[in-house]
């Protein structure tokens, strides 16, 4: 969440986009437990299948425009499918997710460089990636 809203602030996103990013960042992995129960796996493709319905249940009583809710569900249902990135909200969510996953998954410096070249586009996302992982001589 922190990385997503930090990048969104730097990108000067409008309030609807910012809210979409914030909710999606909090909820994007919400399908993990359902995926593990149904498929015995928390793989991204299963999270994408299960996540939107779990998020719909959680957000049903939250006052948000339907368009924003639907975009949140779309982002949750596609956040591991990088060729579907179709907007700044999706771009920021993916970059923020990578910033966390690189640390959690102990991704190699060479792989980080590849991710940077293939995925990262926002100025703040690139700055965070460089500062946290590529400018650090301990990696």
Model-assigned labels for residue ranges:
Residues 42-46, 87:
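Residues at secondary-structure transition points
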Residues 2-14, 27, 64, 79-139:
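Divalent metal-dependent phosphate-bond-processing catalytic cores, especially two-metal-ion Mg2+/Mn2+ enzymes
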Residues 18-40, 51, 73-80, 97:
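His-Asp-centered metal-binding catalytic motifs of divalent-metal-dependent phosphohydrolases/nucleases
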Residues 1-4, 45-61:
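An active-site-proximal "capping" alpha-helix that borders the catalytic cofactor pocket
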Residues 13-23, 62-76, 89:
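Acidic/histidine metal-binding catalytic segments
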């Amino acid at each position: 969440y922190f990385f997503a809203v930090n990048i969104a602030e730097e990108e000067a996103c409008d309030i609807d986009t910012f809210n979409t990013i914030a909710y999606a960042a909090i909820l994007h992995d919400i399908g993990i437990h359902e995926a593990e129960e149904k498929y015995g796996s928390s793989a991204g493709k299963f999270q994408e299948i299960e996540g939107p319905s779990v998020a719909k249940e959680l957000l049903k009583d939250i006052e948000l425009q339907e368009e924003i809710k639907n975009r949140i569900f779309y982002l949750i249902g596609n956040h591991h499918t990088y060729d579907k990135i179709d907007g700044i909200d999706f771009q920021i969510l993916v970059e923020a997710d990578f910033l966390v996953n690189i640390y959690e998954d102990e991704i190699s410096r060479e792989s980080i460089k590849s991710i940077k070249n293939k995925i990262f586009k926002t100025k703040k996302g690139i700055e965070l990636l460089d500062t946290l992982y590529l400018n650090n001589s301990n990696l």
